[in-house]
Amino acid sequence: MSKPIPPLDLMWLLMESQASPTHVGALLLFEKPKRRPNCVREIVTAYRSYAPTPPFNYIPELRRTRMPRFQEARTYDPQYHNHHIALPAASTYADLLRLVADLHESMLDRDRPLFRNWIIDCVPDDRFALYVKVH
């Protein structure tokens, strides 16, 4: 299935460059539930268990020979889109923010659905984080 790219989405895709990416990101912090010691692993498993639904399964098709369209992804790699990482021992919130800044810097791969998630374990104060990057 394919569908026309809405004008606002198309504007962001056309304006984007390596020097000026136009994706957005969100960092969410959570307290670990006291009675769920494996909650982070459970979340990672859940995220990797489901294929994305529209619009998160679309890939932009920007050819000069036809109207720009979103094409449904033929394949989906849950490991690529849903990462599980842990901060090193004794990390601080500043370390978390540096990590997220580094993750945010690169453009999303336009040959794959335009989102990535990082579930980040070992955040200070017995927390975990979710960093979401979308176009």
Regions found by a protein language model. Give the residues of each.
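Non-catalytic N-terminal regions of enzymes
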Residues: 1-135
